């Protein structure tokens, strides 16, 4: 890696770490951690399938599109994680403790955030009245991943950006 790129990366990592530590410390209250843990768990695959299942029944076209979106996102972010191999903050730093078990080894990008934003964009385009709830949930989930010690802010920002793009693309095929 060229020296100028390495220097920029090092500055970015330092900023990421400062923000991750600040958010992690700010939420050092057991009740808040428990609430954010519940929010984070709501972004797990079984919950997404529990949402997509009824969609397949209510509106098969939207349900199938949501399934395809989820599959496409997996195909995007798994190789990125394998390529970047970024350690999770709770693994790399002793002062950041994981308040939940990470779903995989690497942190970049945040798959939970990617899926939450992608589905929020898609479902908001389908049912605009749900947009505040869906976008609010996606933002809360993204914050929870940093607070709980399993992601850096840049992980969730990258996940959100990818999810926004894939969700917007998928929304073009809504009936």
Model-identified regions with their sequence ranges:
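Interfacial segments of alpha-helical transmembrane regions
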Residues: 51-76
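Membrane-water interface at transmembrane helix exits
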Residues: 56, 80-85, 124, 171-175
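Alpha-helical transmembrane segments in multi-pass membrane proteins
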Residues: 68-73, 77, 159, 163, ...
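Residue-level signature of the transmembrane alpha-helical core
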Residues: 35-38, 53-54, 67, 135-139, ...
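Core segments of transmembrane alpha-helices
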Residues: 43-52, 112-120
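N-terminal transmembrane-helix/juxtamembrane module of multi-pass inner/ER membrane proteins
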Residues: 1-47, 77-103
């Amino acid at each position: 890696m060229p020296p100028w790129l390495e220097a920029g990366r090092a500055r970015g990592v330092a900023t990421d770490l400062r923000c991750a530590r600040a958010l992690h410390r700010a939420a050092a209250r057991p009740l808040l951690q428990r609430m954010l843990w519940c929010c984070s768990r709501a972004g797990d695959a079984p919950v997404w399938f529990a949402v997509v299942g009824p969609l397949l029944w209510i509106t098969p076209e939207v349900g199938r599109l949501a399934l395809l979106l989820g599959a496409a996102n997996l195909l995007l972010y798994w190789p990125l994680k394998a390529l970047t191999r970024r350690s999770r903050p709770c693994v790399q730093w002793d002062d950041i403790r994981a308040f939940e078990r990470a779903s995989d080894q690497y942190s970049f990008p945040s798959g939970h955030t990617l899926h939450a934003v992608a589905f929020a964009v898609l479902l908001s385009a389908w049912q605009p009245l749900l947009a505040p709830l869906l976008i609010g949930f996606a933002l809360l989930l993204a914050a929870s991943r940093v607070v709980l010690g399993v992601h850096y802010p840049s992980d969730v920002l990258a996940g959100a950006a990818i999810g926004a793009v894939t969700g917007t693309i998928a929304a073009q095929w809504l009936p």
